[in-house]
């Protein structure tokens, strides 16, 4: 540990203790703290990093700026869990304390092998003044490796690749390494932006997890956004999926969507050679969802977690900024295939935490439940409506499922959020997972998902679906 690291450790611990004391003294300052969703102890959280299960324990690292609830220099915060429900904060794992990551320990992934956790990330270096997320030169995106044998103490950082090691037709935007092993060889994908402002994913290969060679690039037939970041490659059944968050989609259907999108392509062929990409499928149609990352559990499930936020969004915000923190993760989701479609559902561990409150037909009303799951099943009529906390409405009519707020003022429940929707021929079932300040909605067994933050004054709910079964369970 060098002098800079020691100073950063003290500063972070001081900021965290100050926030803890503040919330102990003020109920209003902890009002919107979540029960199921991971949040920063203080300051800002964004991308999930290094998601894995290591020696039976789940690890979730996160982009962490403890000194500013609106973002700042990035480091890796660290949580662990035995069940992905109850998490324990382990402190800051990685600090920006080396010449090759001095302006931020940016996003990356974990790879588990031989009793060790290999953490790969992008070390950010800013060489000149400017809007670093948008300029084409003037910054470094270095690929860095750290190894831990116990998930608690982290070894010496090793710089693996620099800008000069990437193809020369790229801007300075190469980042977010995700690593896996296949047929005895190690592979890495990274997001990239070309000099022509075209987004793509780079594929590297290695025989030893340290020395990497560029192998291929994956891109759409026509330009699709100017940057593809946070790439992830995995298989669900026989389907090969390339997940990536895309910046720069404009016009057409994207006008009614978020600033940036997160979704996946199905791959026909081989990303190491000849391939064909499907159309781009969104992971989530709601307001707050970006930079997802997946990992495989020891029992073979593919788990998916995202930042429950949206970068560069001027339309809406979060009032928790005023109380010293901002953002959370989505609740962990299992990705699965049903009838040829990729779907998502809350992890099965949640079932043990549910306590039945009501199970009725057609209509339900309740109050005083900030953390709950509601399901509507056996929907036979092409119309239903759910009202949460008086101003968040989920409804289906005329082939369109909508999530919309009746009050879009930035001081209201919505904090500026308006409406998101998807066209669905038929809705058969609905699952709502609500936390103190977030809602996730799973339509048709998770074929479509909507995520949003919300900030209620009262916790009320009403549901009307003629002939359908409505079940409400409190989550303890």
Which stretches of residues belong to each language-model region?
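Beta-rich accessory regions
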Residues: 18-24, 260-476
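Repeated scaffold domains used in trafficking and secretory/extracellular systems
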Residues: 228-231, 290-292
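Beta-rich carbohydrate-recognition and catalytic domains
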Residues: 1-176, 181-224, 237-285, 308-357, ...
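Juxtamembrane/interface motifs at transmembrane-helix termini
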Residues: 234-237, 470
């Amino acid at each position: 540990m060098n002098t800079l690291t020691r100073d950063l450790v003290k500063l972070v611990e001081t900021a965290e203790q100050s926030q803890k004391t503040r919330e102990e003294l003020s109920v209003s300052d902890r009002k919107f703290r979540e029960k199921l969703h991971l949040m920063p102890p203080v300051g800002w959280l964004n991308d999930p990093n290094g998601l894995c299960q290591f020696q039976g324990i789940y690890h979730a690292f996160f982009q962490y700026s403890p000194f500013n609830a609106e973002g700042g220099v990035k480091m890796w915060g660290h949580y662990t869990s035995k069940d992905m429900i109850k998490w324990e904060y382990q402190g800051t794992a990685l600090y920006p304390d080396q010449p090759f990551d001095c302006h931020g320990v940016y996003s990356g992934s974990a790879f588990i092998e031989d009793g060790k956790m290999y953490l790969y990330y992008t070390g950010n270096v800013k060489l000149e003044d400017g809007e670093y997320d948008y300029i084409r030169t003037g910054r470094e995106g270095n690929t860095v490796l750290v190894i831990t044998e116990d998930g608690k103490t982290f070894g010496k950082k090793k710089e693996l690749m620099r800008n000069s090691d990437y193809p020369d037709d790229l801007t300075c935007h190469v980042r977010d390494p995700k690593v896996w092993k296949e047929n005895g060889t190690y592979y890495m994908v990274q997001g990239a932006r070309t000099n022509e402002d075209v987004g793509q994913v780079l594929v590297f290969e290695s025989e030893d997890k340290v020395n990497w060679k560029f192998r291929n690039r994956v891109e759409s037939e026509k330009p699709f956004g100017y940057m593809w970041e946070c790439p992830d490659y995995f298989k669900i059944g026989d389907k090969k999926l390339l997940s990536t968050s895309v910046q720069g989609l404009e016009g057409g259907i994207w006008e009614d969507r978020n600033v940036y999108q997160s979704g996946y392509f199905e791959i026909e062929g081989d990303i190491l050679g000849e391939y064909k990409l499907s159309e781009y499928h969104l992971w989530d149609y709601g307001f707050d969802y970006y930079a997802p990352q997946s990992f495989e559990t020891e029992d073979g499930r593919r788990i998916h977690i995202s930042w429950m936020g949206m970068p560069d969004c001027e339309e809406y915000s979060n009032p928790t900024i005023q109380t010293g923190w901002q953002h959370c993760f989505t609740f962990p989701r299992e990705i699965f295939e049903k009838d040829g479609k990729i779907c998502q559902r809350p992890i099965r561990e949640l079932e043990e935490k549910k306590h039945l409150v009501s199970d009725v037909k057609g209509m339900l009303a309740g109050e005083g439940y900030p953390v709950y799951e509601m399901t509507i099943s056996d929907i036979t009529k092409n119309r239903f409506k759910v009202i949460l906390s008086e101003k968040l409405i989920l409804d289906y009519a005329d082939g369109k499922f909508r999530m919309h707020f009746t009050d879009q003022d930035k001081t209201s429940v919505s904090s500026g959020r308006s409406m998101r929707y998807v066209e669905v021929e038929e809705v058969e079932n609905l699952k709502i997972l609500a936390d103190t300040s977030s809602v996730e909605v799973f339509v048709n067994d998770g074929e479509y998902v909507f995520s949003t933050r919300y900030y209620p004054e009262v916790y009320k709910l009403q549901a009307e679906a003629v002939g359908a079964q409505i079940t409400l369970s409190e989550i303890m």
